[in-house]
Swiss-Prot record:
It is found in: Cell membrane. Belongs to the UPF0756 family. Keywords: Cell membrane, Membrane, Transmembrane, Transmembrane helix. It is a multi-pass membrane protein. This is UPF0756 membrane protein Exig_2210.
């Protein structure tokens, strides 16, 4: 019963915040649970959902290449100015950080729970976009790594 109430609450937060992604995701899970397919679908969705989501986002990003709107010339021209170079480097940095985040999320379920809570808050109240768990986990992994180094240095 708690899961139903939680999902209904998320739908309501999505409605209040006018966040279609949160509404659709929570309603989808609510429907799957209500019709009794949760036992069959949730394990696969939980195990592979992030990979599916990243794949879908990647496909959406690649559409301009597939349509011919972006070719090799545009790609090369995009990194000639300072904005392009900074964006290029930011893309590299974020991808590396997110890779570390995936590992952290798989290692510790509590990290995933805390990130989920933060992401729900950001999506619901600040009109955030729920790509945050991967980046959030990557940033958390980076900060945790730095924390460990500092603690080791202090404790000798």
């Amino acid at each position: 019963m708690e899961a139903y109430l939680f999902l209904i609450g998320l739908v309501l937060i999505g409605v209040i915040a006018q966040n279609k992604s949160l509404i659709i995701a929570a309603a989808f899970l609510l429907i799957i649970k209500a019709i009794g397919l949760d036992g069959r679908l949730f394990p696969s969705l939980q195990a592979k959902g992030i990979t599916w989501g990243v794949t879908l986002i990647t496909a959406a990003i690649l559409v301009p290449i597939a349509t011919g709107d972006i070719g090799f010339r545009e790609l090369l021209n995009s990194v000639r100015g300072h904005i392009g170079i900074i964006s290029f480097l930011a893309g590299i940095f974020v991808a590396i950080i997110a890779a570390h985040g995936v590992g952290l999320m798989k290692e510790d379920p509590l990290v995933t729970t805390a990130l989920l809570a933060g992401t729900i808050l950001a999506v619901g109240l600040f009109r955030g976009v729920p790509v945050g768990p991967l980046i959030g986990a990557g940033i958390a992994a980076l900060v945790i790594g730095m924390w460990d180094i500092i603690v080791k240095a202090i404790s000798g």
